Curated annotation (Swiss-Prot):
Protein name in the entry: Nodulation protein W
Modifications after synthesis and translation: Phosphorylated by NodV.
Designated gene of the protein: nodW
UniProt cross-references to InterPro entries, sorted A to Z: CheY-like_superfamily, Sig_transdc_resp-reg_receiver, Tscrpt_reg_LuxR_C, WH-like_DNA-bd_sf
Gene Ontology MF term list: DNA binding
CDD domains with a match to the protein in the record: LuxR_C_like, REC_FixJ
UniProt DNA-binding residue ranges: 175-194
Compartments in which it is found: Cytoplasm
Keywords assigned by UniProt, alphabetized: Cytoplasm, DNA-binding, Nodulation, Phosphoprotein, Transcription, Transcription regulation, Two-component regulatory system
Modification 4-aspartylphosphate occurs at: D70
Any single Gene Ontology cellular-component annotation: cytoplasm
Biological role stated in the UniProt entry: Member of the two-component regulatory system NodV/NodW probably involved in the regulation of the transcription of genes involved in the nodulation process.
HTH luxR-type domain sequence ranges: 151-216
A Gene Ontology biological process term: regulation of DNA-templated transcription
């Protein structure tokens, strides 16, 4: 299945300047209006659709968001839409709502990564609480992605030798041990280490180790990295 569903964002949309968006996919017009009014009444931005295909064909801003999704929809069902989003590598927390839920359906939804599964009728506050939890999850995911992206950019500014030194230092090796691993003089390792700390903007060794863990980098001892 293909569509125009695009999360690259539209001009001017940033995490800092744009509120979280609640996307709603509900085929029942009265229910869709009710949900839209509920979310707007507490200051949330809402974009509503009558079908999953309609949402797939829309261009969406890439901002913190969640999806309130009816299970039973015309054409592409809510559960199948969840699968399609995963296939398209689109990550958005999903809150399922249904008036005809059962255990297998709930299990499939939760295994697919749904944040919650609410049976109609549900309390307004119950849904609002689920939306808050879902948008917070998405905010943290995006924040983590930005952190990793920033660290990768900094790491790529290091020379191959500096990268090798960082990897070894992050394993807990002393300068003398790093020097032996790379066949360098200890004073040279100290210089490279200083460059690494500065370029990575690390305030301490512990800070550098945390960065290495976040990046998932490691070094094999006896690895000889050339300049």
């Amino acid at each position: 299945m293909t569509g125009r569903f695009d999360w690259r964002g539209q001009g001017g949309h940033t995490e800092a300047s744009t509120k979280a968006i609640v996307f709603v996919v509900e085929d029942d017009i009265s229910m869709r209006r009710s949900l839209t009014n509920l979310f707007r009444s507490v200051g949330l931005e809402v974009v509503a659709f009558g079908s999953a295909r309609e949402m797939l064909q829309s261009t969406m801003p890439d901002v913190t968001s969640c999806l309130v999704l009816d299970v039973r929809l015309p054409g592409l069902s809510g559960l199948d839409y969840q699968t399609e989003l995963a296939r398209l590598n689109i990550h958005i927390p999903i809150i399922f709502i249904t008036g005809h839920g059962d255990i297998p359906m709930t299990v499939r939804a939760m295994k697919g990564g749904a944040v919650d599964f609410l049976s109609k009728p549900f309390r307004d506050q119950e849904l609002l609480d689920a939306v808050v939890a879902a948008t917070e999850r998405d905010r943290k995911r995006r924040e983590a992605q930005r952190t990793v992206a920033n660290l990768k950019s900094l790491f790529e500014t290091l020379s191959p030798r500096e990268q090798a030194v960082m990897k070894l230092v992050a394993t807990g090796l002393m300068n003398k041990q790093v020097a032996a691993e790379l066949g360098l003089a200890e004073i040279t390792v100290k210089i490279y280490r200083g460059h690494v700390m500065k370029k990575m903007r690390a305030r301490s060794l512990a800070d550098l180790i945390r960065m290495s863990e976040t990046l998932g980098i490691s070094a094999n001892h006896t690895e000889q990295t050339q300049v």
